[in-house]
Amino acid sequence: MSEVAQNSPAEVQAKKVVYCGVCTLPPEYCEFGGTAKKCEEWLKDNHAELYQRLYSEEALSSNLSELSVSVRERAAKDAAKKEAKAAAAEARDAERKAAAKVQIKRVERNKRKHVTVITGLEVHGLENKKVAKELGKKFATGSSVTKSPAGVEEITVQGDVSEDVKEWLLELYGKEIPESNIELVEDKKKKTSG
């Protein structure tokens, strides 16, 4: 039998791809997102050589010279439209966050038993399950995430810890939630006369 020389194939190396820190796309595709200007600034600060390759005067003029005048105008309009949409969405989110209230409600269960119900954390970018777990550890009580009759997720903590929860939220999440957006509410069950 003849020996066949086996050539081992060259090892395949994974290509290192840079992803934008703003829109999480490769920088070549940032122009198709709504945050092109921010992406361009990020690229300039973090990857200067790639910025020069994509956004230098020569690169831009060579790309534009290949396009017809009508296509250039349309591209400029589309870019402006996308940028305006992204800015409007950002402003809307900021406005919603500023207006959103975190409500800490003390609810009477039985005669001297209370629970604390917290709603509105998810608007500020906090995960209810994680916060509920942290609250349970912090105050050594039972805490859970439940859906209210209105369909909104809320955190229920056993015991009257509303003041402590407010202080704890401000201490841990003061950057996300301003103090003016946290309100304490006391809710008593109505006595039924029988």
From Swiss-Prot:
Record-linked Pfam families: DENR_N, SUI1
Protein name per UniProt: Translation machinery-associated protein 22
Domain named SUI1: residues: 102-173
Domain notes: The SUI1 domain may be involved in RNA binding.
Top-rank taxon, per record: Eukaryota
Family the entry assigns: Belongs to the DENR family.
GO molecular function annotations of the record: translation initiation factor activity
Record's keyword annotation contains Ribonucleoprotein: yes
Keyword RNA-binding among record annotations: no
A cellular component annotation (GO) from this entry: ribonucleoprotein complex
